[in-house]
Amino acid sequence: MNPRYVLKKELLFDPCLDIVGNRLPNYFLDRAAADSSVELAALRTLATGLTDDQVAVIFPEGTRSSAKKRARAMEKIRERDPARADRLAGMQHLLPPRPAGSAALLDGCPAADVIIAWHVGFDGLDTFGGILRHLARRPLPVQFHARRIDRADVPTADGFAVWLDEMWVQSDRAVHALLQQEGSE
């Protein structure tokens, strides 16, 4: 498999990601770009010409999740689109997706299926302090779940954002159920 990644531009501060990441067909997205159309066009170009043995990977949330980031993201969504905020209101673990980048990738490769993936077990490992706290506890098993969705079952245009939100709400519920199960063992 030959992946093409969409990564946030801030990751270029890591010398390894800067050197290796720029030698491969990846795109480092400027999430604060004044003109997002340039960034979205680059994502369409990145996905153009994907073959059956290649994959484009995007993290629709845009960054690692935390309660503070989730609250801030939901606040922004509520200001712009109250109906969407209502759809996403029950999420407890994942950040809401930002659909424009995913839609741009799919526009670039209209025949590609979609894989929705989520995981548990890395919670709290996003800071050095979190790693130290995690070392003092019984380790949780890492679990990764992925689901392939035939492209014919993925809506286009305005329906895509609603569909992606639904996928994220389902994934958030699955994460919650798994964490509840692990907490009761």
Label every PLM stretch briefly.
Residues 1, 51-52:
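Short helix-terminating capping/connector loops at secondary-structure junctions
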Residues 1-37:
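Catalytic core of membrane glycerolipid acyltransferases/transacylases, capturing the structured
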Residues 6, 42-45, 101-104:
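Short, hydrophobic/aromatic alpha-helical segments in well-folded domains
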Residues 8, 29-31, 117, 147-149, ...:
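Conserved beta-strand termini and adjacent loop/short-helix elements that scaffold enzyme active sites
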Residues 12-24, 52-155:
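A cross-family acyltransferase "interaction/gating" segment
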Residues 36-48:
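A Trp-anchored, charged/polar loop motif used as the substrate-binding/catalytic surface
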Residues 105, 181-184:
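Exposed, interaction-prone extracellular/peripheral surfaces
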Residues 137-182:
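A recognition module on extended beta-rich or small alphabeta surfaces enriched in W/G with H and D/E
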